[in-house]
Amino acid sequence: MEPFYYQHLEKSEQTIYHAIKTGLMALEDHFLVPYADPARISMIFFLVRLDCPEIFYAVTFKLRKWPQSDNLEILPEYLFDKKTIRQQQKAMSARVEKLARAVSTKTELEKELYIHDFICENIHYDKLKKPYSHEIIGPLGHGVGVCEGIAKSVKVLCDALGIWCIIVISEANPEKKIKYRHAWNIVKIGKTYYHLDATFDLSLSKTLTRHDYFNLSDDAIFRDHEPIMTEHVPCTDGSHFYYLEKKLSFTKQEEVKKRAAQAAKKKKPFLFHWRGGYLTREILKKLLIGIEEAAKEKGKQAKVSLNWMQAVLCVEFEDMDEAVAVSMQKSDDVDNVEIEQANEGELL
């Protein structure tokens, strides 16, 4: 199947795309492309790297125009010398093959979950934003990455496992204090498209592996994501949303209290999604009261954190005699809830 972004280019642009891809794969020092607006060539170069995350070593280029020529010459700027690139290509291929082999016989949904959890449990967000963290060698080679490198790693693993996957990009929004563009994935499971943002879940996975952004619809993802600036497909179905699949998505307050009591008894964390209408402060207050009552019945104190935009609550329980300042703080107080930031890497 032709690469996604390649399919959405005009014929003349596909010729440029092919020349760029061929030149980069061959590690050419320079190569020709048909003349076009430099800004458009830059965008096509960018799209090649979204379609082909295995091209991790070429991040920018210079253009040269020769008099009386119908072509432009591209001079790629490589992150490493060619010997190092070839060594890293072998290492990345072996790494991807090994990771993919572990779930090669699983279902598409199981493979997707494996990739997501691998990212959340093994990769650290690189707040220094080193150049290689934007490429697959960051997460897969060094265990660190930013959203672009993480989304590319998800795609290269999906490609290896036969899962349809693209990388999508949203613009920055300084008015909302969003300093950087953001990258995540759209995957196709069965015949349905879903948003998958492993970076946001990684940011939330401090004590538990989170799945707040696993298989979201457009309606859900754009509660806290900016509009996509690249070509993409609509995601109208949220039926494989993780918490829905795991029966951890509730519409009734009594359901939440019952499950909280079970978790408190076992002294296990309780992670759930609320879909019983918009999560207002009033509804949150009622949920917190039920959780606190369930905790006290089991001799526990509840500590609650909240991803408010996605209506996901994380509840942890501790013994009453271990609770800090238990007489001074009530966990059923909305103001005592920790508000989580899933997009901390993109904020100003």
Where are these regions (language model features)?
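Linear, non-domain "peripheral" regions
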Residues: 1-95, 273, 278-348
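Secondary-structure boundary elements
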Residues: 78-139
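Solvent-exposed loop/turn segments at secondary-structure junctions
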Residues: 80, 122-126, 172-176, 200-204, ...
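Conserved short loop/turn motifs at secondary-structure junctions
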Residues: 138-143, 172-174
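Secondary-structure capping and boundary motifs in well-ordered enzyme cores
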Residues: 142-146, 150
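Hydrophobic/aromatic-rich core segments of domains that either
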Residues: 149-221
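Active-site lining segments that contact anionic ligands and/or coordinate catalytic metals
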Residues: 182, 267, 310-314
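Metal-dependent nuclease catalytic core centered on acidic motifs
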Residues: 213-305
